[in-house]
A protein has these predicted regions:
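Hydrophobic/aromatic-enriched cytosolic interaction surfaces used to assemble or bind macromolecules
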Residues: 1-189
Length: 189
C-alpha cells in the first residue's frame, strides 16, 4: 500500500500596503495567524519575507485587498442552481445590461452560495484600468489576485471567531478608513 501523493498547496498570503510599509498575513500549519510588516524601501522584499514563512511551503501566492468603492457588485437570488458555464453567461448578460462599459475593459468574478430554496450569485466587476493601477502599487511584489476588502475582513473575523455568525455587524477601522459589514442569512450589506 502506497502513500497518497498530495499536491502541494500554495500558501496564500494577504498583503496590504500603507504608506511605505507592506503588511503580510497568513495562516501557519496550525491555522494560527502569522504576520510581518516590511518597509518597501528595503531591497528584495521576498527575501526579507522568506525566513518567516513555513519551511515546507516554497510556493506562495500574494493576495491584495481592493476597496469595494472601486468595484461594481450585484447579488442575484435565482430559483435554480447554475453550473459554472451558466454562471459565467449570467454574469456576462448582467454586466452588459447594467454597465455602460465594454466587457473587454472589465475583470469580473462571481461567488455562488446554495440556498434552501434557490441559489445566490454574487457578481463583482472592476475596470481593468483600476485593477492594474491597484496592482502597480505593490510593485515589485507581484500579486496573484485581488480580493474585496470587505470579504477579506469578514474571513479574518470568521478565522478569529472560529465560525461564520449570522445576523452580525462587524466593524473594522484602520488608518485608511473604516468599514461596517452586516452579514445576514441571505445577504451581505
Amino acid at each position: 500500500m502506497g502513500i497518497a501523493n498530495r499536491k502541494q498547496q500554495k500558501l496564500q498570503i494577504g498583503v496590504s500596503k500603507q504608506q511605505d510599509n507592506l503588511y503580510f498575513v497568513w495562516l501557519d500549519e496550525l491555522h494560527k495567524v502569522q504576520s510581518i510588516c516590511l518597509n518597501t524601501q528595503q531591497k528584495d522584499i521576498f527575501s526579507q519575507l522568506l525566513p518567516h514563512l513555513p519551511q515546507k511551503n516554497s510556493q506562495c501566492c500574494f493576495v491584495g485587498a481592493i476597496s469595494p468603492h472601486l468595484t461594481w457588485s450585484k447579488t442575484l437570488i435565482l430559483p435554480q442552481t447554475l453550473n459554472a458555464q451558466e454562471c459565467e453567461q449570467q454574469c456576462r448578460f448582467i454586466l452588459q445590461k447594467e454597465l455602460p462599459i465594454p466587457l473587454d475593459e472589465l475583470w469580473f468574478d462571481y461567488l455562488t452560495t446554495p440556498l434552501k430554496q434557490g441559489f445566490r450569485l454574487d457578481i463583482t466587476a472592476i475596470r481593468q484600468e483600476s485593477a492594474n493601477a491597484e496592482l502597480e502599487k505593490y510593485l515589485p511584489l507581484k500579486l496573484t489576485a485581488l480580493d474585496l476588502l470587505n470579504h477579506s475582513i469578514l474571513r479574518a473575523f470568521y478565522a478569529i471567531l472560529g465560525q461564520e455568525p449570522i445576523n452580525t455587524l462587524f466593524l473594522y477601522q484602520d488608518q485608511q478608513g473604516c468599514l461596517a459589514v452586516c452579514e445576514r442569512l441571505q445577504q451581505r450589506q
